[in-house]
Amino acid sequence: MIKKIVGNNIKNIRKEKKVSQDYIAEVALLDRGQLSKIESGKVNITIETVAKIAQALNVNVSCLFVNSQLNEPKPFVKWAGGKTQILSELKKYIPEKFNTYYEPFLGGGALFFALQPEKAVINDLNVHLMNAFKCFEDETAYHDLIKRLKLHENKNSEQYYYSVREQDREADFWKKSISEIGARLIYLNKACFNGLYRENSSGYFNVPFGKKEKVNCFDLENFNAIFNYFKQSKIKILSTTYQDAIKNAKQNDFIYLDPPYDVYPDKTGFVSYGKDGFDAQAQRDLAECFKMLSNKGAYVMLSNHNTPLIQELYQGFNIRVIHAKRMINSKGTGRGAVEEVIITNY
């Protein structure tokens, strides 16, 4: 546990300071390969080596032993469009103070978990996903969720996967408990091909089996962190349209809009999470919503691809171009660096 904490802290501080492994290895008189293993938490490390690395990073050695991630909730599903990769960029533009936090296109909720707002309204059209989130509000549902996930882990096989996948075709599917629906969503997310959520035209999940002999559906420490956070906060969980989700937003509230992204002119970019899609007109409607919220005096931040349409729609607002890695795509070749924008009205 300690070597993972130290390794993770070394890596994070090094990246924050924008220095290479080669530089740290040279200054600390280490082999670069050894430093890489240390950062991965794969090797034991002496206090003398920690001290050398701390000196190379110009930080107090105690900083490398702090478990900064202890009890900090993180996304429990892998989700297309997830923001874990650009969290450091997003955090640069968070308002210093705000009242209620709104995230109407939640997905995995990377920014939501990173901010841990005391008051929040979270929403996603995917009712399966939001049932999983609702399990963290109720102790009985929470423990049942864990019980069901353990069962999925033990039964995992290709045949079992497809039997679980077909459940939403059943007429009485929505009579199931939130923990059963939530556990199904999480299991399918962990066991499916490439962690990709996709629905067919009828609204049924249709991603094939990922051919994993063993699946780990949950991290108990993270689940407990999420459960404790929800218990100590006022979180309203919805599964409705984004317009409905933000209708009560007021002055000094903070709204983060992370819609399905606009496509590039060459039609690249995985944006079809659900059966309804999100076309150019939907992007225009969202831009009007952005302006409406701005006129209310709310803080609004939006993420999207850096396309001509998005540049046109948000003229007059603060547009910052960043580079991000696309981590989930139906084709492995569709992953790589892409230009995104972070747009704010402040």
Please place each PLM-identified region on the residue numbering.
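Conserved proline-anchored active-site loop of SAM-dependent methyltransferases
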Residues: 90-93, 101-115, 122-126, 186, ...
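S-adenosyl-L-methionine
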Residues: 70-100, 110
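Recognition helix of helix-turn-helix/homeodomain-like DNA-binding domains
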Residues: 29-43, 66
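SAM-dependent nucleic-acid methyltransferase catalytic core
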Residues: 71-85, 138-256, 260-270, 285
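SAM cofactor-binding core of SAM-dependent methyltransferases
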Residues: 99-166, 216
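Conserved acidic-Pro-Pro-aromatic motif
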Residues: 251-338
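Short basic helix-loop element that most often maps to the first helix and adjoining turn
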Residues: 8-27, 52
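DNA major-groove recognition helix of helix-turn-helix/homeodomain DNA-binding modules
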Residues: 46-63
